[in-house]
């Protein structure tokens, strides 16, 4: 019996060892945080532009002070020396594009933090995966972080957090196989902008079925038709994972009766998925209205929210502005061939 018990224990240990070796360190959550893997954690910031091991905080406030974006805080750090916050940010001149990160894969972006100055609509972030010439993500920085009106508003969700005083955080997992390049362009022709940032990523094997992260930015100002296109021209197999909308109301009254529609896999006149109203899609109801105060009420949850309301005087007055998000984290919209998403302008 002892021999059998020992053999059984050895088999269990061997199985656990193989199981641990197969874990790649992706898809982290409270349920697997205890698990070890061979994934390597790296981080890129102005204090370590390459993310290389043992290369952080090397800027010298004296030797590097005249080098562009190498010792931007040298005046404050000159008496402290190397390793004391010598280069915590970068400056981006008007009409200049700066490479925030360039990473050799395989691996995945796991978290991004940044706090950019300037007009957020005039700063464009782009993500290039592998050998792409055209970016998979091209979006004003404010809209990418659910702050399209250029005004701070706190947001607490699983995918995006906006924290005091203007801290943008992204938790979308973004795998890549060969390499990743992230750039930021300042399209303001007159003003320099500054950004503090940290891009946290892992170097690890990526599953064969892993898709690449994409984001489209579209603006209708004003919306001249009954439908606003959220995304279009998407070909191939994928899944739609979320929407952020900055919506301005140019007349008085309720504005959110429009239905969101998902046209997929050859749908023409009629979609496969059709919602029941704008506030319904963003997981609210009955005009987002607090029935006691008779006012719109902000809310921010892990999956959906109306986190921003910029009010003139009066509950249904013209020129109110809203920020809303809806993440399909547990309910991605899967498609095999193509996808187009629209939302109606109806009040």
Residue ranges and their predicted role:
Residues 21-347:
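Beta-strand-centric surfaces of beta-sandwich/beta-rich domains
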